């Protein structure tokens, strides 16, 4: 239709020092909270929260990232991209999900960011941590790939 503009959500994420920034277009395909020990070590926290976007929707708008590749508990390799200055891990690309990039939700610094839709690797969750009971939970990764919205 002539004269009609599409309103697509644009969100920006940045590292702790601000020298590396991303722009994410559209809504995430899925938002997951992960308790795996790898994410606990990577974040220094009890879990990580990732917004999974199509890789083509994630664009570096400032700085250059450094990468670190390793084998994950899911049996696939993952490449983590982080700021070479402050070390913040902004996003990762898992071979298990070849079309998606997981962006660290905390890097958006947006308290109105959508709520996670699922919990993964719940078998490694700290026993005293309480999460909303209505959040679907998987002992490890869900058996199917992340569905597209």
Q: What name fits each language-model region?
A:
Residues 2-149:
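A short Gly-Trp-Pro
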């Amino acid at each position: 239709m002539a004269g009609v503009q599409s309103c697509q959500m644009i969100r920006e994420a940045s590292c702790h020092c601000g020298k590396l920034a991303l722009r994410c277009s559209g809504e995430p395909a899925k938002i997951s909270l992960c308790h795996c020990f790898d994410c606990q070590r990577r974040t220094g926290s009890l879990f990580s929260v990732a917004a999974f976007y199509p890789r083509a929707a994630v664009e570096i708008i400032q700085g250059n990232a450094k990468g670190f590749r390793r084998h994950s508990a899911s049996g696939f390799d993952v490449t983590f991209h982080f700021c070479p200055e402050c070390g913040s891990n902004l996003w990762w690309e898992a071979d298990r999900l070849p079309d998606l990039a997981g962006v660290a939700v905390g890097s958006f610094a947006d308290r109105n960011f959508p709520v996670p839709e699922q919990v993964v690797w719940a078998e490694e969750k700290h026993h005293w941590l309480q999460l909303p009971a209505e959040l679907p939970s998987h002992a490890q990764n869900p058996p199917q790939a992340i569905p597209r919205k």
